[in-house]
From Swiss-Prot:
<dbReference type="GO" id="GO:0016567">
    <property type="term" value="P:protein ubiquitination"/>
</dbReference>
<keyword id="KW-0862">Zinc</keyword>
<feature type="binding site">
    <location>
        <position position="92"/>
    </location>
    <ligand>
        <name>Zn(2+)</name>
    </ligand>
</feature>
<keyword id="KW-0479">Metal-binding</keyword>
<dbReference type="InterPro" id="IPR008598">
    <property type="entry name" value="Di19_Zn-bd"/>
</dbReference>
<keyword id="KW-0539">Nucleus</keyword>
<dbReference type="Pfam" id="PF13445">
    <property type="entry name" value="zf-RING_UBOX"/>
</dbReference>
<dbReference type="GO" id="GO:0005634">
    <property type="term" value="C:nucleus"/>
</dbReference>
<feature type="region of interest" description="Disordered">
    <location>
        <begin position="1"/>
        <end position="23"/>
    </location>
</feature>
<dbReference type="InterPro" id="IPR027370">
    <property type="entry name" value="Znf-RING_euk"/>
</dbReference>
<dbReference type="GO" id="GO:0008270">
    <property type="term" value="F:zinc ion binding"/>
</dbReference>
<keyword id="KW-0808">Transferase</keyword>
<dbReference type="Pfam" id="PF05605">
    <property type="entry name" value="zf-Di19"/>
</dbReference>
<comment type="function">
    <text>E3 ubiquitin-protein ligase that promotes the ubiquitination of various substrates. In turn, participates in the regulation of many biological processes including cell cycle, apoptosis, osteoclastogenesis as well as innate or adaptive immunity. Acts as negative regulator of NF-kappa-B-dependent transcription by promoting the ubiquitination and stabilization of the NF-kappa-B inhibitor TNFAIP3. May promote the ubiquitination of TRAF6 as well. Also acts as a negative regulator of T-cell activation.</text>
</comment>
<feature type="binding site">
    <location>
        <position position="107"/>
    </location>
    <ligand>
        <name>Zn(2+)</name>
    </ligand>
</feature>
<feature type="zinc finger region" description="C2HC RNF-type">
    <location>
        <begin position="92"/>
        <end position="111"/>
    </location>
</feature>
<keyword id="KW-0833">Ubl conjugation pathway</keyword>
Length: 229
């Protein structure tokens, strides 16, 4: 079986989101949903999207490519890229086990070690717990960081951003993280769409006791996310 390092074809290299060259998934990742391509389609500018993601991007009157901002039009099936996804192996960031690229989506939803990998990313943006308390925003509803829309629950905010702002590249503060006791209200995510889809697939408010310290809080989130798998 092939390793996840061959030269990319069908525009896969251009379609990949900005990522470390050491990430074997970066060349096979849809820039909209940030998952391994499903039914990849290559558009005229050379970039590649999942078929379903492309359909969403084509809905505006004047659709543009979310990667290069050129005019967007229906594309053609990326047959060679699809073949690679069905034959190339990569490893899970959590358990390090190898999987075919087409199977990695399903695996990470049930891998407890991958959940730990995700939470390490959350902790990387936290503040020192010894800082003075501050006014904490409403943790149950959130404003959109891109537009005036507000009063979204967590799931609603994720869906709104995916449908309305998937091509917006502006750096913004995550309103969900900013509402948490450990959150930094001045920290701007360089890729907010990736952040919100990878970090906020479950609700912190359901899982944590806000009276405990940061480490205990993170552990509570992890334990519940593992149980709920």
């Amino acid at each position: 079986m092939a390793a996840a390092q061959p030269e990319s074809r069908d525009g896969a290299a251009q379609s990949a989101k900005p990522a470390s060259e050491t990430d074997p998934l970066s060349r096979f990742t849809c820039p909209v949903c940030l998952e391994v391509f499903e039914k990849p389609v290559q558009v005229p500018c050379g970039h590649v999207f999942c078929s379903a993601c492309l359909q969403e991007c084509l809905k505006p009157k004047k659709p543009v490519c979310g990667v290069c901002r050129s005019a967007l039009a229906p594309g053609v099936r990326a047959v060679e890229l699809e073949r690679q996804i069905e034959s190339i192996e990569t490893s899970c960031h959590g358990c390090r086990k190898n999987f075919i690229l087409s199977k990695i989506r399903a695996h990470v939803t049930s891998c407890s070690k991958y959940q730990n990998y995700i939470m390490e990313g959350v902790k990387a943006t936290t503040k020192d717990a010894s800082l003075q308390p501050r006014n904490i925003p409403n943790r149950y509803t959130f404003p959109c960081p891109y537009c005036p829309e507000k009063n979204f629950d967590q799931e609603g905010l994720v869906e709104h951003c995916k449908l309305t702002h998937s091509t917006d590249t502006k750096s913004v503060v995550c309103p969900i993280c900013a509402s948490m006791p450990w959150g930094d209200p001045s920290y701007r995510s360089a890729n907010f769409m990736e952040h919100i889809q990878r970090r906020h697939r479950f609700s912190y408010d359901t899982f944590v006791d806000y009276d405990v310290d940061e480490d205990d809080m993170i552990n509570q989130v992890l334990q519940r996310s593992i149980i709920d798998q």
